């Protein structure tokens, strides 16, 4: 999974935060939907987290030997050093 881009204005203003996403995954590991479960408190950080998550691939859940669709909670941290 590639991390999201850090918005330049938020970097400049030293804004950090964590966006918690709920990602719906199909049986092949593709992303069906992304929702913000808990905002970072910054719209631009949340937007970049969702944008990145839509490009990710996951290992789907396996139940009774079959890959199935599922949902996962993913925290996305934006932190400056």
Where do the model's predicted regions map?
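Short proline/glycine- and basic residue-enriched helix-capping loop/turn segments at helix->loop/beta transitions
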Residues: 1-24, 47-81
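Loop/turn elements at beta-strand to alpha-helix junctions within RNA-recognition modules
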Residues: 12, 27-28, 42-43
């Amino acid at each position: 999974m590639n991390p999201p881009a850090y918005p330049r204005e938020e970097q400049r203003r030293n804004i950090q935060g964590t966006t918690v996403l709920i990602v719906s995954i199909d049986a092949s590991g593709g992303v069906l939907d992304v929702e913000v479960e808990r905002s970072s408190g910054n719209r631009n950080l949340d937007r970049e987290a969702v944008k990145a998550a839509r490009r990710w691939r996951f290992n789907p859940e396996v139940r009774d030997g079959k890959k199935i669709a599922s949902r996962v909670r993913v925290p996305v941290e934006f932190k400056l050093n």
